[in-house]
């Protein structure tokens, strides 16, 4: 009995040893073949990078809670605050949720709100879209788009506009300002309601 026990023990040890060696060998082959594939992938990537020297790197720079500041031609300051600005190119930004303060002169301030817009810092043009509101003293001005020349103090709009002053109102199809915002010209289907008590 002791010899059969020793024989079985020897056989089991040999089987365990063969299984362990087999597992290690299979692992070695898998690792080696994976390394070769990675090496081939790296070579293919290097080759394709050498062949394609013009890289098309596209990325967006997104600025959260941004402020853009400047002055107009009379050196009155303006400040544009936005919840998000996406840099389109060198000095051009797509803006979301805009709140701006524009000093027309030392005594008068124009407050500007819009849901979206586009700022070109080179030309100092602010294009506003989607629920544009301008507040000037007691005047409220609503439109769907407006283009503001921040330096020359001109505002134009090609969508319907409505000006409210206390109980009076003016509506039109488009508008523009003249003489540094002191004159507003309403164009197309102009309707005026004037309350003389205002």
UniProtKB/Swiss-Prot annotation:
Regions that span the bilayer? 11-31
Q: Reply yes or no: does the keyword Ribosomal protein apply.
A: no
Question: What is this entry's stated membrane topology?
Answer: Single-pass membrane protein
Its primary localisation, in coarse terms, equals membrane
* Disulfide bond annotation, renumbered to this chain: none
InterPro entries associated with the record:
LipoPS_assembly_LptC-rel (IPR010664)
Entry's localization field: Membrane
Thylakoid keyword on record: no
Give the UniProt entry's GO cellular component terms. Answer: membrane
Keywords per UniProt: Membrane, Transmembrane, Transmembrane helix
Pfam families the record matches: LptC
Q: What is this protein called?
A: Uncharacterized protein RC0660
Q: Which organism is it from?
A: Rickettsia conorii (strain ATCC VR-613 / Malish 7)
